[in-house]
Amino acid sequence: MQKLINSVQNYAWGSKTALTELYGIANPQQQPMAELWMGAHPKSSSRITTANGETVSLRDAIEKNKTAMLGEAVANRFGELPFLFKVLCAAQPLSIQVHPNKRNSEIGFAKENAAGIPMDAAERNYKDPNHKPELVFALTPFLAMNAFREFSDIVSLLQPVAGAHSAIAHFLQVPNAERLSQLFASLLNMQGEEKSRALAVLKAALNSQQGEPWQTIRVISEYYPDDSGLFSPLLLNVVKLNPGEAMFLFAETPHAYLQGVALEVMANSDNVLRAGLTPKYIDIPELVANVKFEPKPAGELLTAPVKSGAELDFPIPVDDFAFSLHDLALQETSIGQHSAAILFCVEGEAVLRKDEQRLVLKPGESAFIGADEPPVNASGTGRLARVYNKL
């Protein structure tokens, strides 16, 4: 049981104030602090302090003793800590993304390797052979887009902009998955005069349309005034998560984080296919091949937790990670698992005890627990988030 020393990622879309206001993390340079990373990702591993006072990378510590740190099942299955845990602070919209499924990730990675595409090339889609399932848990009101709306909903929303592009009129005639695929690709392929004309029709509609998703389009247009991704809120569900609500992001499903602070848990992968709201490379044929053009009602997007005493367990449909929340104010609790775990203090104060060892976590602080350690006794006043594996 060791306290983690974590790193902050400074991406342009990040908030300059959220991590300071929530967790007292200093920002003397006033940089955008987008993400606090907890884990053993090779790009930026957390660090731990050993018994002799030396600070080492968590990734290196795990590498030296995988079975003890990860548990036999996780070590055999993944060979590394299979998840990355983050605090994500979005002050402005992130790009619309799609994550390929596991099989397509393996095929795409092998294909790009065989083609000799450098790992850091702009046109590289697959950085590894893994899928990238994600869970987002809102700490503040959190605005996002996730999955295609029901076709009847898309039809009614597209009516005011029917003249923007022929593919819109085409979809309105026969609203099905095939024509949604054509519409999605056509909007992304727009260039020059065609794109200017379409965006002019959309922006004119903003003058007469009220409420959502038009308000979200207005917000996004402040940052991406000339991006064809401005049509996306008409096609995708706009989701407002309240603090404490969570949502799982499936493979082959377009999504975007727009504003707010959340905990995010994800598999260890950097495979992203972009689909708008970005100046970066968009591989449209590869993107379309990796998207399921099927509707998902907004009411089905939230992940409902299962309550057991003071624990809320959020069901995850993959083995790469599990996520639960522990309310220490309700009762003292014993936390144990057959895998590694990262515990994060969401609010209040958590006191962790194991044998003679005592560790206090304040809001924003986290600890790593190895698979071979006995259960930890957790008490205090706040809430503790736990990421681990159920293998």
Protein language model annotation of sequence segments:
Residues M38-A40, V87-A91, V98, P133-P141, ...:
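Short, conserved beta-strand element in jelly-roll/cupin
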Residues K307-G309, D319-Q337:
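Conserved short histidine dyad/triad with adjacent acidic residue
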Residues L94, E134-A144, G260-P279, F321, ...:
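A short hydrophobic beta-strand segment most commonly corresponding to one strand
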